């Protein structure tokens, strides 16, 4: 859980920018999107293999 306190003399925009930076750095949103719904292990393996194949093809 990210926690950001407003510093003295800091605007709300600056605080929000710092909060967004800490959330993206922690990977909170990525983790939430990943856990949005359950993916069976077999399906997960197939998706990862397909992504790796596509990535290799681009190189």
Curated annotation (Swiss-Prot):
| A GO biological-process term | translation
A Pfam match is: Ribosomal_S21
> Does the keyword ATP-binding feature in the UniProt annotation?
no
Q: Name one GO cellular component term.
A: ribosome
* Entry GO MF terms: structural constituent of ribosome
Keyword Methyltransferase in annotation: no
Residue spans making up a coiled coil are none
Q: Which domain of life is it from?
A: Bacteria
Check the record and name the InterPro entries matching this protein.
Ribosomal_bS21, Ribosomal_bS21_sf
Q: Which UniProt keywords apply?
A: Ribonucleoprotein, Ribosomal protein
NCBIfam families for the chain: S21p (TIGR00030)
The family this protein is said to belong to: Belongs to the bacterial ribosomal protein bS21 family.
Name used for this protein in its record: Small ribosomal subunit protein bS21
What is the protein's species of origin?
A: Acholeplasma laidlawii (strain PG-8A)
